[in-house]
A protein has these predicted regions:
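N-terminal Rossmann-like FAD-binding beta1-loop-alpha1 element of flavoenzymes
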Residues: 1-7, 133-144
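Glycine-rich FAD pyrophosphate-binding loop
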Residues: 3-19, 148-161
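Short amphipathic alpha-helical segments
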Residues: 19-20, 80-84, 138-140
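Short glycine-enriched, charge-decorated loop/helix-capping segments at active-site entrances
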Residues: 21-26
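A Rossmann-like FAD-binding core segment of flavoenzymes
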Residues: 28-78, 85, 95, 102-115, ...
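Beta1/beta-strand and adjacent pyrophosphate-binding region of the FAD-binding site
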Residues: 118-131
């Protein structure tokens, strides 16, 4: 009964953003592995290191399978195109977190492009963005040995209790403290970053 299911994954491990985008301290990867074991036992076939459209033509997929479901993660990021963006030392979360997760998993210290992992060890770190991804970066930076970590949020600090503008059952706009925030760092609200400043091609501050 049912259908035979094959999952194609571009990376070398199954799990997508759950495995490479979320830090180990927030989601232990053993839970993913356990679920994959269950799915494999139930008959799901997983094929890694397959880039559909590059390694495997879409025409072949459509010929060999009765249905094709597109479930790729959103790895494209929103940039901040302000003066100084080209300086070294400015990284996107989706550059930083996957490499840090690979190091945690015991993978080689260079990625598929030969680049070393980005580390916050011994550095003063500023995170632009006050959401969950920023908190993931904050916790990762602490674990890597950052000297200090500041997280900037463009919006004002939310209220301590549910705002009238977000009544039930809408998602409440409230001030929240994640486990990463409990470990330290400074959160700064109502900050609009307008320029990165640097010296000798490397970022040294922002305005």
């Amino acid at each position: 009964a049912g259908h035979a299911v094959t999952v194609f994954e571009r990376a070398d491990r199954i799990g997508g953003l759950l495995r490479y985008g979320i830090p180990e301290f927030k989601m232990e990867k053993r839970h993913i592995d356990r679920r994959l074991e269950q799915m494999t036992a139930e008959g799901t076939e997983f094929r890694t290191k397959v880039n559909v459209g590059v390694d495997l033509p879409v025409e072949r997929l459509r010929a060999e399978f009765d249905a094709v479901v597109l479930a790729g993660g959103a790895t494209a990021w929103r940039d901040l195109p302000i003066p100084g963006r080209e300086l070294d030392g400015i990284h996107q979360a989706m550059e930083y977190l996957p490499r840090a997760n690979r190091v945690q998993l015991g993978d080689p210290v260079v990625d598929e492009h030969g680049e070393p992992p980005i580390t916050a060890k011994g550095k003063k770190v500023v995170i632009i963005g006050g959401g969950d991804t920023g908190a993931d970066c904050l916790g990762t930076a602490h674990r890597q040995g950052a000297v200090s970590v500041h997280q900037f949020e463009i919006m004002p600090r939310p209220p301590e209790t549910r705002a009238p503008s977000t009544p039930w059952p809408t998602y409440p706009l409230m001030f929240r403290v994640s486990s990463a925030h409990e470990e330290g760092g400074e959160r700064v609200f109502s900050v609009n970053t307008e320029e990165f400043v640097g010296r000798d091609g490397r970022v040294t501050g922002l305005r």
